């Protein structure tokens, strides 16, 4: 007999611990947005590990719109996320494909901006992001998806740095849903540090 699956709260707590230990750093950093910060979050050590990917797939899937047929995101941060969510959906017997949005059109072949099984025009797509600061990466992905004819109204991120990203996304008629806010990850990192 296999053990019972962990509760959603246990998964959420484990994911927060993993992000605090493996993704969060305190120091002096220049962010992708060009801003300076004392906090840095690189989710890839978690999103590129098998166990982290499993946790993220389940956690993010919960916030994908029920009528979405795809999840998509800008390469590179969203690549493992869209794959994990599509797999978690399949395991839950839900059809949900993954798309990767290129930062620029492919320079050969089809010159495509999007990679993956393309849904019909007008389909709803939920955008996934690892970290939202200003919202620039998400907005670039959304722009390409909307220009291709897809309906995008929600962005789901692992961490919202709370530095204007939500406001920028709201201005583009997008709802931002975050698993965690930066202060939650930073606080958990401090707690874990004092425990050792």
Swiss-Prot record:
Keywords of the record: Glycosyltransferase, Magnesium, Pyrimidine biosynthesis, Transferase
Catalysed reactions, semicolon-separated: orotidine 5'-phosphate + diphosphate = orotate + 5-phospho-alpha-D-ribose 1-diphosphate
NCBIfam families documented for this protein: pyrE
Any single GO BP term: 'de novo' UMP biosynthetic process
Pathway assignment: Pyrimidine metabolism; UMP biosynthesis via de novo pathway; UMP from orotate: step 1/2
Family: Belongs to the purine/pyrimidine phosphoribosyltransferase family. PyrE subfamily.
Enzyme Commission (EC) number: 2.4.2.10
Functional note: Catalyzes the transfer of a ribosyl phosphate group from 5-phosphoribose 1-diphosphate to orotate, leading to the formation of orotidine monophosphate (OMP).
Protein name: Orotate phosphoribosyltransferase
Keyword presence, Glycosyltransferase: yes
Keyword Flavoprotein recorded: no
Species this protein is from: Prochlorococcus marinus (strain MIT 9313)
Superkingdom field: Bacteria
Gene3D superfamilies: 3.40.50.2020
Binding site for 5-phospho-alpha-D-ribose 1-diphosphate: 102-103, 106, 108, 129-137
Residues engaged in binding orotate: 133, 161
GO molecular function: magnesium ion binding; orotate phosphoribosyltransferase activity
SUBUNIT field: Homodimer.
Cofactor(s), by name: Mg(2+)
Top EC class for this record: transferase
């Amino acid at each position: 007999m296999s053990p019972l699956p962990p509760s959603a709260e246990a998964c959420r707590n484990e994911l927060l611990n993993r992000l605090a230990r493996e993704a969060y750093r305190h120091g002096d950093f220049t962010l992708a947005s060009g801003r300076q910060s004392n906090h840095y979050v690189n989710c890839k050590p978690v999103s590129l590990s098998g166990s982290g990917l499993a946790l993220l797939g389940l956690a993010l899937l919960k916030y994908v719109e029920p009528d979405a047929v795809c999840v998509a995101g800008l390469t590179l941060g969203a690549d493992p996320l869209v794959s994990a969510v599509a797999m978690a959906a399949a395991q839950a017997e839900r059809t949900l494909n993954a798309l990767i949005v290129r930062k620029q059109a492919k320079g050969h072949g089809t010159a495509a901006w999007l990679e993956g099984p393309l849904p019909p025009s007008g389909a709803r797509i939920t955008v996934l992001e690892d970290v939202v600061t200003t919202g620039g990466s998400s907005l670039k992905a959304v722009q390409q998806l909307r220009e291709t004819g897809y309906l995008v109204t929600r962005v789901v991120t692992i961490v919202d740095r709370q530095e204007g990203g939500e406001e920028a996304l709201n201005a583009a008629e997008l709802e931002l849903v975050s698993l965690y806010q930066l202060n939650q990850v930073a606080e958990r990192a401090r707690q874990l540090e004092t425990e050792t």
